[in-house]
Amino acid sequence: MIKKIGVLTSGGDAPGMNAAIRGVVRAALSEGLEVCGIYDGYLGLYEDRMINLDRYSVSDMINRGGTFLGSARFPEFRNEDVRSVAIENMKKRGIDALVVIGGDGSYMGAKRLTEMGFPCIGLPGTIDNDVAGTDYTIGYFTALETVVEAIDRLRDTSSSHQRISIVEVMGRYCGDLTLAAAIAGGCEFIVLPEIPYTREELVNEIKAGIAKGKKHAIVAITEHICDINELAKYIEQETKRETRATVLGHIQRGGAPVAYDRILASRMGAYSIELLLQGYGGRCVGIQNEKMVHHDIIDAIENMKRPFKGDWLDTAKKLY
């Protein structure tokens, strides 16, 4: 019988994490459960830095970006002895189960705790939208708005100077954020990790656009594919057009969550409590066709693959 749960945020922060914490806390309290917040993710779990939360602890949190509990990367959590300390810390505080909000790296920690007999539920919190088993992750839609706004601003100055602009978008090894932002921002060219790319092919496409009369262009590219400053130099050399590179960086993680992220986070937070009360552990929450779903967390990490939105890319190419 679960009487008290813990909640933490782990990995890179994402807008809507506070709304998810709020959803967990208030749904748990409505069921008569106690809630303990863990500071700085798995690091705080290991260092026994926790605080009891009530409904007022999460007042005015639904609209705040970031995570008030904090987050930290803690690779030492792979060590079983470290995890044993974390479990003992939770047990001495009377915590019976844990809700983990984060990406697939955070899920791995939850999986390992579950394998050691401590029930965990994972909520997908990352702007990258790269977690399997869910159509969307908490923070993705807010980051999308941020990226599109940046592209709109770049278009203004690119048009004024008849310039080629390259914008690097987060996403790690998933192109969802780049692809959606490129369509919404009207980008002329898109470079994604899912599609083989050569800079020669990109330059040929840009030259073809110039031949059609394009005065300026925006290239959206997912991070980790190449050095975009070097790419900008190469494009300028080959096209004789001024080319500038912009790395959006961590501004994509900040800001108040948009309405959909607040709703998604609230629904997922409340659903995690339903699952725990039904006796589930080692599960991760997702949304598919606007319905809450749950999967084995091992499947989400190791076996399930996110489908690539090839039809979206086809649409984008028609609009170049």
Swiss-Prot record:
Pfam families reported for this sequence: PFK
Ligand binding (substrate): T126, I127, D128, R163, M170, G171, R172, E223, R244, H250, I251, Q252, R253
Annotated binding of ATP, by residue: G12, R73, F74, G103, D104, G105, S106
Cellular component GO terms held in the UniProt record: 6-phosphofructokinase complex
Pathway connected to this protein: Carbohydrate degradation; glycolysis; D-glyceraldehyde 3-phosphate and glycerone phosphate from D-glucose: step 3/4
Cofactor: Mg(2+)
Catalytic activity: beta-D-fructose 6-phosphate + ATP = beta-D-fructose 1,6-bisphosphate + ADP + H(+)
Active site: D128
Binding site for Mg(2+): D104
Binding-site residues for ADP, renumbered to this chain: 22-26, 55-60, 155, 186-188, 212, 214-216
Family (UniProt): Belongs to the phosphofructokinase type A (PFKA) family. ATP-dependent PFK group I subfamily. Prokaryotic clade 'B1' sub-subfamily.
Described function: Catalyzes the phosphorylation of D-fructose 6-phosphate to fructose 1,6-bisphosphate by ATP, the first committing step of glycolysis.
UniProt subunit comment: Homotetramer.
Protein's name according to its UniProt entry: ATP-dependent 6-phosphofructokinase
Organism field: Erwinia tasmaniensis (strain DSM 17950 / CFBP 7177 / CIP 109463 / NCPPB 4357 / Et1/99)
Gene: pfkA
